């Protein structure tokens, strides 16, 4: 469950509980900025939430205000602290390196030393507002982290999820450091993701605006079988891969998605 910000939706824990009780649903996770998490965390635990991904791009207050245009870093950290009280719920921190000097990515990484959390660095994808940032490739990021972090080596244990992230063990760390590098390390061949936006639009690839309007099918009186057929059509037309190229250069052509990730759900 992504967003925008899913916790602004009323009765979100109740939705999680309903999803958990549906046949065929194996796991329910939620991505949030954490601002509204503290007061809802107990309810999510009772609902059976399996995992939390909390977006945190920096621990610097000034930098956080510039990125988010809000002064809410303290509330996000309170949400993380509350989530740590429920070890049965997998907790991951999502950080998007933006190529700005005061983001202090190493400080974010050290959260995995001090707490039982996995910190994942997600490469900026040049869609929506992401086209305006240079971003940081995985190789650049490994160099930055290598200057301050202890020795780290590829993690070879049991999978820590069903997505594209690959992880590293770091000496003395409680959690792992992970990388989701869609541009510099293209993984489209293993992609197992589709997204349903808050407007009911089914997207099969983040780069492209193509997909299916499921809300229109439902509001048009479509049956469950008709809805299933539309979903299967969309899956059959899922692109082989994105065309961002091998670098993180700005992409301004008409092929890329115009919406930002908050509008798509991420």
What do the PLM-derived regions correspond to, one by one?
Residues 114, 124-127, 131-266:
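Auxiliary Fe-S-binding modules of radical SAM enzymes
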């Amino acid at each position: 469950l992504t967003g925008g910000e899913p916790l602004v939706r009323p009765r979100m824990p109740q939705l999680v509980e309903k999803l958990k009780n549906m046949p065929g649903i194996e796991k329910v996770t939620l991505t949030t900025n954490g601002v509204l998490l503290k007061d809802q965390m107990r309810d999510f635990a009772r609902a059976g939430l399996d995992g939390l991904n909390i977006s945190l791009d920096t621990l610097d207050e000034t930098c956080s205000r510039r990125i988010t245009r809000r002064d809410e870093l303290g509330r996000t950290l309170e949400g993380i602290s509350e989530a740590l009280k429920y070890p049965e719920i997998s907790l991951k921190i999502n950080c998007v390196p933006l190529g700005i000097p005061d983001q202090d990515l190493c400080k974010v990484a050290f959260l995995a030393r001090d707490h039982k959390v996995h910190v994942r660095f997600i490469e900026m994808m040049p869609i929506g507002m992401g086209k305006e940032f240079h971003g940081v490739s995985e190789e650049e990021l490994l160099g930055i982290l290598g200057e301050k972090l202890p020795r780290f080596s590829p993690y070879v244990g049991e999978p820590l999820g069903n997505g594209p992230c690959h992880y590293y063990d770091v000496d003395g760390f409680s959690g792992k450091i992970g990388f989701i590098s869609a541009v510099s390390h293209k993984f489209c061949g293993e992609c197992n993701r589709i997204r349903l936006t808050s407007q009911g639009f089914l997207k099969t690839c983040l780069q492209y605006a193509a997909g299916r309007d499921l809300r229109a099918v439902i509001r048009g009186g479509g049956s469950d079988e008709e809805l299933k057929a539309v979903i299967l059509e969309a899956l059959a037309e899922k692109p082989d891969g994105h065309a961002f190229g091998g670098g993180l250069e700005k992409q301004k052509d008409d092929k890329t998605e115009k919406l930002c990730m908050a509008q798509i759900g991420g």
